[in-house]
Curated annotation (Swiss-Prot):
InterPro entries: Ribosomal_uS8, Ribosomal_uS8_CS, Ribosomal_uS8_sf
Transmembrane segments: none
SUPFAM superfamilies in the cross-refs: Ribosomal protein S8 (SSF56047)
NCBIfam families, alphabetized: PRK00136.1
Function: One of the primary rRNA binding proteins, it binds directly to 16S rRNA central domain where it helps coordinate assembly of the platform of the 30S subunit.
Family designation: Belongs to the universal ribosomal protein uS8 family.
Molecular functions (GO terms): rRNA binding; structural constituent of ribosome
Subunit structure: Part of the 30S ribosomal subunit. Contacts proteins S5 and S12.
Name listed for the protein in its UniProt record: Small ribosomal subunit protein uS8
Amino acid sequence: MVMTDPIADFLTRIRNGNMRKFDVVEAPASKIKRQIAEILKAEGYVKDVEYVEDNKQGVIRVFLKYGKNGEKVITNLKRISKPGLRVYVKSDDVPKVLNGLGTAIISTSTGVVTDKVARQTNVGGEVIAYIW
């Protein structure tokens, strides 16, 4: 069966693993998923990201992060731009998630970046997801 939205599947695997308090979540690898996973790691939402090569497309392992008392670091993860309804923003209209407490992941001409980086470099693009 063909997957219509692999990014949504990747984010859903992370969201479900987070709700069930899994240590590791695995998903089929792609370039954009790797970039999203690296942003999650850089922003402190996950512990680590590992790429495992098999003879096909590879696998991304995301090591989820929890607080001292087991509280979730990721409160919510929401897909914004979908295959049926793409959401694009200009450089002036880059959104702030929860007034700056969350992070928007944006696919720009310079690559996949956070909302903060998009604002600093004055670029717009497709809003992939919100995370807080």
